[in-house]
Amino acid sequence: MAAARCLRWGLSRAEAWLLPPPTSCCHRALHRQVEGTEFRSAYSLDKLYPESRGADTAWRVPGDAKQGNDDIPVDRLTISYCRSSGPGGQNVNKVNSKAEVRFHLASADWIAEPVRQKMALTHKNKINRAGELILTSEYSRYQFRNLADCLQKIRDMIAEASQPATEPSKEDAALQKLRIENMNRERLRKKRINSAIKTSRRVGTD
């Protein structure tokens, strides 16, 4: 009995040394499956905007046609993050949650030329000396939400600039003319009042 027990114990020890543990086999198989791949977060740009890679999927319209409804090519943008301003405690002081998106407007061929020209005139205060249109967002505590807000601002700008200019009706033109006349009349009235006040001060000193 003792000899058989010793034999069984020796065989079990040999199997333990010769056979790899099942977890290592699983790890090796998993490593072979993911070898050559790259980990991407659920909030990576490729997963948040899967249809926005390259200029082929971007806004490109012939002539003066209306701008399309496709997404923005994220790989054509320069995206950075920095500290937010305003209240927020330690989260504001330690986390780079503010998103900044910029791109060169004149060379953005994924936007139609007439739309780019109109955007350059309408939003000239957002364009730096290098010709880059800069947008920022810090309304949220999270980077990906602020980035999404910046992209939505670009969409709104493109949609606004894509609207064709409409001629005002006769009623609107007459109303606009009346408003301008009233503004000029009020401006001249205030100017006369200020002139009378200055004249009265000079008379009082004499």
Curated annotation (Swiss-Prot):
Keywords: Hydrolase, Methylation, Mitochondrion, Protein biosynthesis, Ribonucleoprotein, Ribosomal protein, Transit peptide. Gene3D superfamilies: 3.30.160.20. Its EC number is 3.1.1.29. One of its GO terms (molecular function) is translation release factor activity, codon nonspecific. Disulfide bonds: none annotated. SUPFAM superfamilies: Peptidyl-tRNA hydrolase domain-like. It is found in: Mitochondrion. It is an enzyme of class 3 (hydrolase). It catalyses: an N-acyl-L-alpha-aminoacyl-tRNA + H2O = an N-acyl-L-amino acid + a tRNA + H(+). Component of the mitochondrial ribosome large subunit (39S) which comprises a 16S rRNA and about 50 distinct proteins. This is Large ribosomal subunit protein mL62. It comes from Bos taurus (Bovine).
